[in-house]
């Protein structure tokens, strides 16, 4: 099992334009290549490629030009400059004899309705994270786990070591999230469960090993929306074979339709009785085949479904 993450997905594609967030944050191995005709490396790759189709990787911002409402005022000029230089869907239209399968990741910005008027006929599918507007050949895909943010970041290795570790759950619910990343969604959640004997609430930062260990010691985990619609926590929860508890959302109901998830209208509805009555979701999580969350199998299936 090799978990899904944005960098690994980028590496699997025939050509990657890199991502803006990695370059902005100067993370290890970052790069960003322009999605326009001045990118002669890409043009040459197209001309030398003998396959009927190519797989491409890019971040959501540079996939297509539009007005992004969620951009903070101080970031707008930077975001606009990215879209001014790069527009992958427009670039694909310049090569009508080649077909493209596009993947995105490493991005919090959502895919919106404007995309549907931008897709050229030779793009077979767009497989994007945070694709809250989806349908036809636009498919939402998992955010997966966090990439390595510095040379000492060993979280992927820790997660791999924990996937098959058998830890018997001692409690029902685990709560661990930073409120400041989305106060509107997350404020007040911790307080709902602080005095509950059947829940463990982390009120301070713990290391990644302890986080995953505590997650495995519970059957369910609260998974609220964070910086983006999707969150690495959702997928860490599934890799640990624990049940995400999420507010009802048509995006997640579609994206996670193959996995046991407890959807609620409000986190205040989460009670001990509710979790006990949904024990079957935990049992299902122990039996479910997670092959679809292996990066190679995930990638191959999308390509095969697209061609």
Protein language model features and the residues they cover:
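A cross-kingdom feature marking charged/low-complexity
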Residues: 268-277
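Nucleotide-sugar donor-binding catalytic core of glycosyltransferases
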Residues: 1-235, 239, 243-259, 274, ...
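Conserved acidic donor-binding segment of nucleotide-sugar-dependent glycosyltransferases
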Residues: 261-267
């Amino acid at each position: 099992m090799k978990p899904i993450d944005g960098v690994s997905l980028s590496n699997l594609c025939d050509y990657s334009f890199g991502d803006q967030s990695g370059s902005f944050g100067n993370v290890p191995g970052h790069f960003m290549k322009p999605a326009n005709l001045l990118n002669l490396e890409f043009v040459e790759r197209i001309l030398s490629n003998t396959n009927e189709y190519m797989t491409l990787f890019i971040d959501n911002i540079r996939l297509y030009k539009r007005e992004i409402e969620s951009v903070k005022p101080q970031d707008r000029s930077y975001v606009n400059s990215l879209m001014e230089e790069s527009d992958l869907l427009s670039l694909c239209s310049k090569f009508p004899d080649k077909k493209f399968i596009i993947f995105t990741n490493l991005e919090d910005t959502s895919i919106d309705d404007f995309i549907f008027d931008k897709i050229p006929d030779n793009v077979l599918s767009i497989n994007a994270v945070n694709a809250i507007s989806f349908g036809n050949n636009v498919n939402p895909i998992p955010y997966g786990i966090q990439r390595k943010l510095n040379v000492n970041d060993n979280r992927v290795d820790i997660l791999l070591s924990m996937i098959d570790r058998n830890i018997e759950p001692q409690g029902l619910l685990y709560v661990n999230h930073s409120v400041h990343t989305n106060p509107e969604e997350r404020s007040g959640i911790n307080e709902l469960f602080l005095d509950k004997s059947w829940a463990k609430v982390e009120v301070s930062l713990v290391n990644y090993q302890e986080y995953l260990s505590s997650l495995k010691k519970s059957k369910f985990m609260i998974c609220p929306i964070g910086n983006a619609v999707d969150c690495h926590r959702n997928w860490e929860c599934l890799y640990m074979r624990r049940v995400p508890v999420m507010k009802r959302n048509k995006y997640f109901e579609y994206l996670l339709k193959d996995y046991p998830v407890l959807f609620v209208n409000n986190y205040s509805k989460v009670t001990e009785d509710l979790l006990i009555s949904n024990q079957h979701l935990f049992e299902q999580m122990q039996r479910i085949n997670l092959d679809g969350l292996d990066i190679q199998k995930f990638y191959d299936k999308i390509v095969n479904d697209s061609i």
